[in-house]
Regions:
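Periplasmic OmpA-like peptidoglycan-binding domain that tethers envelope proteins to the cell wall
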Residues: 110-199
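Extracellular beta-sheet/turn segments enriched in Thr/Pro/Gly and aliphatic residues
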Residues: 40-72
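Periplasmic peptidoglycan-binding/anchoring modules of Gram-negative envelope and division proteins
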Residues: 75-109, 132, 136, 194-195, ...
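Surface-exposed coil/turn segments at beta-strand junctions on protein surfaces, enriched
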Residues: 11-13, 21-25, 50, 63, ...
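A short, solvent-exposed beta-strand micro-motif common in secreted/extracellular proteins
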Residues: 16, 22-37
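Short, acidic Ser/Thr/Gly-rich low-complexity loop/linker segments typical of extracellular
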Residues: 3-17
Length: 199
C-alpha cells in the first residue's frame, strides 16, 4: 500500500520470490501473509530517488504454532522488572500483535536451574505477567494474552542453530541439570542464559 493511494497485491512465485514495480516519491507499507504463518510488515520509501533502483527484501514468516523466542526482553536480576533495554523487543511484539489481529498468544517465561524450584516458578509467572501488562498498556486486548510461567520445567533443547553457535552443545541435547553440571563454569553460564527466556 502506497501513501499515494496505490494498493497492489502480488503472489510469490514457487521459489518464494516476488517482484513489484513501485512509483516514485511514495512511501510504502508491504505486508506478507501466508496461511499458517504470522504476517510480517515492512516499510520502504522511494522519496528522493533520482534513478531506477532495485530494492530487495526477504520476508521470513514464523509458523503460528511454533514458539517464537523474544531475544530482546530483559529483566532485572532475580526480579520481574523489565529493563529499559527491553523496550525495542517489547515494541516489536506489540507490532507483531497489531499486524496479526486474529491471533492469541501464550506468553511463556522460563528461568535457569539456579535457585529454588518454587521461587523460579513464581519469578517466571511474574515475568510473564510483566510482559502482558506492558502489551495491555500499549493497546493489546488482554483476551488475546495468556501469561504462563514455567520456571525451570522446560529447559531448552539444542537445535541446529544453537549447535552451530555453541559447538560444545550437542544437537537435540536438553539443557537440564544433569547435563549442565558436567560443563565448566563458563559453559554452565551459557546454558543458564539460554534457559532464561521469554517466548
Amino acid at each position: 500500500v502506497g501513501d499515494n493511494g496505490t494498493n497492489v497485491k502480488a503472489q510469490s512465485r514457487r521459489d518464494g520470490t516476488y517482484r513489484l514495480k513501485l512509483d516514485k516519491d511514495t512511501r510504502y507499507v508491504m505486508l506478507a501473509t501466508s496461511r499458517g504463518y504470522l504476517n510480517q510488515k515492512h516499510e520502504l520509501s522511494t522519496i528522493g530517488l533520482k534513478d531506477s533502483y532495485l530494492y530487495a527484501f526477504d520476508f521470513t514468516l514464523a509458523p503460528i504454532s511454533k514458539p517464537v523466542k523474544m531475544n530482546n526482553i530483559f529483566f532485572e536480576f532475580g526480579k520481574w522488572t523489565l529493563t529499559p533495554e527491553s523496550e525495542n523487543g517489547l515494541n516489536e511484539l506489540v507490532q507483531l500483535l497489531n499486524d496479526n489481529p486474529n491471533i492469541t498468544i501464550e506468553l511463556s517465561a522460563h528461568t535457569d536451574l539456579v535457585g529454588n524450584d518454587a521461587d523460579n516458578k513464581t519469578l517466571s509467572i511474574r515475568r510473564a505477567q510483566s510482559v502482558v501488562d506492558y502489551l495491555i498498556s500499549h493497546g493489546i486486548d488482554s483476551q488475546r494474552l495468556t501469561p504462563v510461567g514455567y520456571g525451570e520445567e522446560k529447559p531448552v533443547i539444542i537445535d541446529e542453530t544453537l549447535h552451530k553457535q555453541y559447538p560444545y552443545l550437542p544437537k537435540d541435547q536438553v539443557l537440564n541439570e544433569a547435563f549442565i553440571t558436567t560443563l565448566s563454569a563458563d559453559k554452565q553460564e551459557v546454558c543458564n542464559s539460554l534457559n532464561r527466556r521469554t517466548e
